[in-house]
Amino acid sequence: MKLIIKKIYVIAGILMVSLLSGCETDWLDEQPLESLSASTFWNSKDDTMLALAGIYRAGHIGTNAYTNQVLCFTSATDDSSYKHGSVDNMYSGYFKPGDVENVLVIWNRAYTTIFRANYFLENIEKVQMDVADKEEVIAEVRFLRAYEYYYLSTMYGGVPLVTKVLSVEEANTQKRKSLQEIVTFCIDELTAAAKDLPATRPDTERGRILKGAALAVKAKLLMIHQRWAEAATTYKEIMDLNVHSIDPRYKELFEEVGETSKEIILSTNIIANIYGNTHNQLNWHPDFYGGYQETNVFQGLVDAFLMNDGLPIEESPLYDPAHPFDNRDPRLYASIFLPEYTEFRGILYLAHPSLTNKGIGTPLRGATGYGWKKYVTENYTGNVYSSGDDVIIIRYAEVLLGYLESKLESGDNITQDLLDQTINEVRGREAVHMPPVTETDRDKLREIVRNERRVEFCLEHPTRYIDIRRWDIYTEVMNQQFYGMKLTDTPETYTAYPVETTGKYRGHLKSINKTGTVKPESALLPIPQYEININPELEQNPGY
């Protein structure tokens, strides 16, 4: 919808605020000049499209707020850390229900979208429009509502399941449904939505939900809950659409020039200078180049990238500790700023803690020496405070790797043809061209697939955050010691900055200098304390 959404987002945003803030006021009985009541609104297809845009805008796939959550929860893993607020507490075992910075915004945004979707579905039949068009927009709204429940259930577990517009009294007495009930609802809704969604759209409708997106979210949810055979079948449905494909590019996928790629199945809808993105070209920018560098990539992620002979750094004869970034998987260079190696805008990236800060974020100097490069555009000249860069949520590479993992875990036969259709298709893109995988031993292949997901999707939609939880390795990886770039070969006598016994930088964040233990219960977020105060029927997650 990005091409058409620019024309209607502002109107829709204002309109939907006035229409849908009614959960706190008797707005149906009033019609001030700045608002519209239901009796004067649901009269035409144009009204429908405005309401639809308002739901897109409210949801997690439609805003810069989601980009912030990608930043935060991608940085709530063993890949990187986020410098600010409550997310850094996740590493230290002190994440609390009152840490509202991201816990509350996820909950509120999701239920705002769900309310808008319910309101839409209760009123759409009033509109006289083509039956096929009506079925399509209903499918879009059912998808958008189901996506919010998918996201809520992934972050919190069971949550209140609301499928109609509620009064304030009803809303404040809702109890949590079981996780299984939420998952069943989501799968049913996504299945129904996929039937009425088109496989493709004209360029003028780019950004509106497609059949592949509904199937991809469904497959991902099935995989999270280890329903492997169903997940494999659903992923195969997407493959058989013959709509999406692996882009030969990699770096450009995460820039504005890549937004039309056939690899992208679902992404945010960001519009420069209207509903812009402050993260890609400012907050993720290293301070060395004038940004805030709000993320700190850990050494463990850097080490996960293989050598370009396809072997880990511990096994490859190409690895040279004195030149650790030479001869690596090309995705490393596209994803991470590497100290004294990456050249960006004609300047060599330097990150030693002794350097005088050259950026605008003096208190925010990086704590590991490594910076987030994915999504940062070298030749960007626009407004860094409101760029138009979308953020990818699901792309076709995840479909292929998800299909392989689902086939592997369901016990199906693993053949070279299957590997070539999936993981080798991903690794073989022109810009990457890593050696093909030939391993068919299940245990060994499982580790290869997991590492491939880590490097292919690093620093994207919180894929790693979800993966380490569904693989049941969350506490294992989160309780390790994190560190950054190597500062010295003589750590036993080095006193300038805190280092590990290997001479690697420890920085200053809680994520690096642990003060607590991450517990298994921390795999789920706490229900926002503010919501429990309003609705005592809500039970808090264990451990909080």
Spans of features found by a protein language model:
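Conserved, well-structured interaction surfaces
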Residues: 44-63, 86-156, 171-184, 190-203, ...
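An aromatic- and glycine-enriched ligand-binding surface/loop that stacks and positions planar moieties
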Residues: 24-87, 183, 191-194, 208-357, ...
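Long, intrinsically disordered, low-complexity segments
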Residues: 23-24, 110-113, 185-187, 254-311, ...
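Sec-dependent bacterial lipoprotein signal peptides
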Residues: 1-21
